[in-house]
A protein has these predicted regions:
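Extreme N-terminal starter segment of soluble prokaryotic enzymes
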Residues: 1-3
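Structural motif
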Residues: 5-9
Length: 173
C-alpha cells in the first residue's frame, strides 16, 4: 500500500484508508518522514501539499521533476542546484518542475522551476536513493510573490478535496 507524506494536518484532513506521515515543513523534516515510511515497509510514497507558482500553472498538478533551490555550490564548479559530487540537478523529468527550499518563497527563485514548495525535492531524492516509487501532487495556493503568505493562508485548505477525488478514483498508479 502507498503511504502519504503530507506536511500539515490541514492538508491531510479527511483522508482515510492510507497511512499518513505528517512531516512538518522543510526538507529535513520531509526526509525524516520519508525514511520513517520506508522503514515501516512502504515501497510507494505519495506526497501532497501546497505550492507557489512561478509560472502560469494553477489548480492541482502532478509534479514530474524536482530541484533543490537552496543548493548553491557554484564556487566548487557545480551548476546552481547541483549537489557536489553528484550528477545532474533534476530528479525526475522536465514537465512540471518543483523547486524545494527551506525558505517560504516570496519571489521567483534563481533556479529554473515552475512551482515552489518546501518538501518535495527531499522526498523525491530520498525515494530515488532508496529505490522507492514516488509521485507528488501540489495544489497551487499562491503566486510566490509579495502576497504569497496571505494567499497561502487563504488557499492552503482548498486543494485537499481535489486531491482526495483523484486519490479515491484510483488515478494514482
Amino acid at each position: 500500500m502507498a503511504a502519504l507524506i503530507i506536511a500539515l494536518p490541514e492538508e491531510a484532513e479527511g483522508i482515510k484508508g492510507y497511512p499518513i506521515y505528517l512531516s512538518g515543513c522543510g526538507k529535513v523534516n520531509a526526509t525524516i518522514a520519508t525514511m520513517r515510511a520506508i522503514n515501516d515497509g512502504h515501497r510507494f510514497i505519495i506526497n501532497f501539499g501546497s505550492a507557489g507558482s512561478v509560472s502560469d500553472i494553477t489548480g492541482l498538478v502532478e509534479v514530474t521533476g524536482y530541484v533543490d533551490r537552496d543548493m548553491d555550490a557554484r564556487a566548487l564548479s557545480c551548476e546552481l542546484g547541483q549537489t557536489p559530487f553528484e550528477d545532474g540537478i533534476i530528479i525526475g523529468e522536465h514537465g512540471i518542475v518543483c523547486g524545494s527550499g527551506d525558505k517560504f518563497a516570496t519571489s521567483k527563485p534563481e533556479i529554473a522551476c515552475d512551482i515552489v514548495d518546501m518538501e518535495a525535492y527531499a522526498i523525491a531524492k530520498t525515494c530515488h536513493k532508496e529505490g522507492v516509487k514516488f509521485r507528488s501532487w501540489k495544489y497551487i495556493s499562491d503566486a510566490a510573490d509579495e502576497n504569497s503568505a496571505n494567499d497561502w493562508e487563504e488557499n492552503v485548505h482548498k486543494g485537499n478535496s481535489l486531491f482526495q477525488k483523484m486519490l479515491y478514483r484510483g488515478g494514482l498508479w
